[in-house]
Amino acid sequence: MSEFISVTYKCVGSDLKDLFKLYEAFWTNDNNKSRKDDWRYKCCIDFAPIVASLGFEPKQYELHGEVRSYHLEGSTLVIDSVTGYCEQKDFRKCIEAKFPSIKVYYGEDDPQSASYYTNDSNGDYFPKYFLESYDNTNFFKTIEDAAESVSTLVGSYVAPSADDIYDALDNYYSGNVVCMEDRYSFREYEVRND
């Protein structure tokens, strides 16, 4: 397990007013004058001030991480963060407690230990399978779609199983000269229900 991992949160709201209030909590903390004067906070926001602005006492929660970026995509607030060791369940639960109309899904990516987790059991916001390269990621809801994409990449049929996809990519890259940046790795999210 890595010391720091990437976690993307997708806050999906049925009530846009609540979603905008949540966005405002991020924006307010991001544009806080006292924070802006401290060079350490030029590019990120700690979880604790956000939790405090939602009306919770940060010291009561395990909060190890910081928001790197956030933006709205329709009725979804996307939060890209770096966290300590694992997805920050307390951060997510504080948002859901403050705004019951918002469900927070996460995708936890730790390439160093090859572990990928999500709480999105339907794959609506974090599809289960994905091919990842240096600067491109393709998501797939089914193993068949992932296998079809790999078949196109390697130029031959690949059976729809994780082992066959791994083998096809390994064989393809061992027999072809491909820049590291252009190599794809196959990944699967493991669903955690909590």
Can you describe what each PLM-predicted range is?
Residues 48-194:
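Charged interaction segments
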Residues 34-41:
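Pyridoxal 5′-phosphate
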